[in-house]
């Protein structure tokens, strides 16, 4: 049985309906972030899907040193706190070093371990010791069963409020594929499982100085993943992906989100 976890006023896992984790790839500025969060809340209320808002304050693993990384931890957390307090929505962001855990945990409902860092024992343990829900993204280089040991590092602290997120596996150069067998394997570990439908269509470094993406496949992979009985869907969204400062090629346009969520919700209702 998959554990049910409370994230603020949202419950994920167990036999609960699908949860959406969504927001911009990176915090571009306060106005844009708040506007995105407000639109997401309106959309999710309209289709009755619980929302956890996500946005990164620092994209520490951008392809190029010249890529936009975000406002930084201090200013970024202030913006996320405003979103949380103004809208009453749980918030998620990623950490990249042990030093970031304590200040991040003061604001975030979910502390996220980036896929590239999921094997960093000290980081996973520190995040879990914060007492917050920890979303561990499966590395593009790991098999799904390898995540049992990763989850075990967090659980060793006494905190078993863990979410496991699949975001594709490396397939040759500049490409990722999503193996649908991963989801039942991950769920057998015992924690809620989320599919990152937008990073899974990323083409890492595919544009030379930045990553490309194939957002036209987000819906197809999302529908397939939800059909396996996953607990949540993770999507990066933007009102104008072509102008997004990070991961625009694989971000979902906000105006396209309601129709997609209705389809995913219908599939979720059938399989649960």
Swiss-Prot record:
Annotated catalysed reactions: D-arabinose 5-phosphate + phosphoenolpyruvate + H2O = 3-deoxy-alpha-D-manno-2-octulosonate-8-phosphate + phosphate
GO biological process, one term: keto-3-deoxy-D-manno-octulosonic acid biosynthetic process
Entry's Gene Ontology molecular function annotations: 3-deoxy-8-phosphooctulonate synthase activity
EC number: 2.5.1.55
CC per GO annotation: cytoplasm
Pathway: Carbohydrate biosynthesis; 3-deoxy-D-manno-octulosonate biosynthesis; 3-deoxy-D-manno-octulosonate from D-ribulose 5-phosphate: step 2/3; Bacterial outer membrane biogenesis; lipopolysaccharide biosynthesis
Pfam families linked to this entry: DAHP_synth_1 (PF00793)
Protein name according to UniProt: 2-dehydro-3-deoxyphosphooctonate aldolase
Source taxonomy: Bacteria, Pseudomonadati, Thermodesulfobacteriota, Desulfuromonadia, Geobacterales
Gene name of this polypeptide: kdsA
């Amino acid at each position: 049985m998959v554990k049910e976890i409370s994230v603020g006023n949202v419950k994920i896992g167990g036999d609960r309906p699908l949860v959406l984790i969504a927001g911009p790839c990176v915090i571009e500025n306060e106005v844009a972030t708040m506007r995105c969060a407000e639109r997401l809340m309106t959309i999710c209320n309209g289709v009755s899907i619980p929302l956890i808002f996500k946005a990164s304050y620092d994209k520490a693993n951008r392809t190029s040193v010249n890529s936009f990384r975000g406002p930084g931890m201090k200013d970024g957390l202030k913006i996320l706190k405003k979103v949380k307090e103004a809208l009453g929505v749980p918030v998620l962001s990623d950490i990249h070093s042990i030093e970031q855990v304590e200040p991040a945990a003061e604001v975030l409902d979910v502390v996220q371990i980036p896929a590239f860092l999921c094997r960093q024992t000290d980081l996973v343990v520190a995040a879990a010791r914060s007492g917050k829900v920890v979303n561990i993204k499966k590395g593009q280089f790991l098999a799904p069963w390898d995540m049992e040991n990763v989850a075990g590092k967090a659980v060793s602290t006494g905190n078993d409020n863990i979410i496991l997120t699949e975001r594709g596996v490396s397939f040759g150069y500049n490409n990722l594929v999503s193996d649908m067998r991963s989801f039942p394997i991950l769920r057998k570990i015992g924690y809620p499982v989320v599919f990152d439908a937008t990073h899974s269509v990323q083409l890492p470094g595919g544009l030379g100085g930045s990553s490309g993406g194939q957002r036209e496949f987000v819906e197809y992979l999302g529908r397939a993943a939800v059909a396996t009985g996953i607990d949540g869907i993770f999507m990066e969204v933007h009102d104008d992906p072509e102008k997004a400062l990070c991961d625009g090629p694989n971000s979902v346009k906000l105006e396209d989100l309601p129709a997609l969520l209705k389809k995913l919700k219908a599939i979720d209702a059938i399989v649960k």
